Amino acid sequence: MDRYFFILTTIDLFVLGFMCFLTRLSESLNKKQKRGFFLAFALIAAISVLEVITIVVDGTPPGCRWLNILSNYLGFGLTPAVALCLVYVLDKKTIIRRGFKAAVCCEGGYLLFLAATLPYGPVFSVSAENLYARGGYFFIYVIMYYASMLYLMAATVRTAAAFQNRSHPLIYPLILFLGAETVIQIAFPALHVTWLCVTLLSVLYYIYCSEMWNQLDALTGLLNQNSYLNRTAEMRRSGGVLVVFDVDDFKQINDRYGHLQGDVCLAEIADCIKKAYARCGYCYRIGGDEFCVLLKDEASEARCAATLQSLLAERRKTLTILPTVSLGSAAFSGEDVVAVKDRADRALYCAKKEQKARAAAAKPADSEEKD
């Protein structure tokens, strides 16, 4: 076996082993994410070893033919599953989405197809002399491989967009890099660099996802305070709008119904803010019950605010304790964000006073109706 390939595989396995331990010891990943990354790294390591086995046993006495067939079958069959493991980590929720279930079924069907057609060798064959050869329908493997990569790319871009991650275009060059490498591998079969590249991609993907999740608030899924501070630290622009939100009488919700119900209310409010404003700006949770949005322009402000109030009213039909939300805004006009934030806060306080006045005026009317 080529010593160069053996050295690459050794480096590959070391990196994957390190990533497995890093995943296991991580305190920022939940159990589902740890499981997905661990399976992906372990699967890449296993397929890398299988590739070594196929090279070692190919052309040896026919007694090793079964090992050659098994190693190639598992290598070709399990390759698309790597992308599925990485898709699995994207959603922190324990619920398995329908699209992912369909992808798993496709992978299962592909494995069954490979097993059923082993005697005929459409994808690959191992002769009686124990010599490997690509089959006439080798493109089936290539299609499954590229389909899994495209599925990973689409799922990642969709998730990153939902999390308002500005670096989501970076996933495209990662997939293109792997796709180009695969073309080279197909054209030059003796050049065994596929799984080294897949290892590199998986490590970069781990870094990418960690960076994406580190920008999020764990409870609400909005961008967190640190993201807000970094984004606005030296921000000076014109044409945009800073909108700040505060939950009215939120302390009473916590005192009366408990902090768990308070968290439910915050999550619902955050979801409404994202649905109302995400297409027009970036949404942040900057404090306990404080949120803000950096709008791209003033034109969408009134429409987004109306949409938010409509969404909150709709949610209040099922979650009756959902409190009202006051907001204030200020346009950017070239000054630093601190000055803009101060003006937005003053507008917010005026809105809260008006909200309290309306609530106080409504109470006597309610009492008269009851009498």
Predicted feature residues:
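Catalytic core regions of nucleotide second-messenger enzymes
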Residues: R285, L312-F332
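Signal-transducing coiled-coil linker helices
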Residues: A154-V157, A161-L219, N226-G240
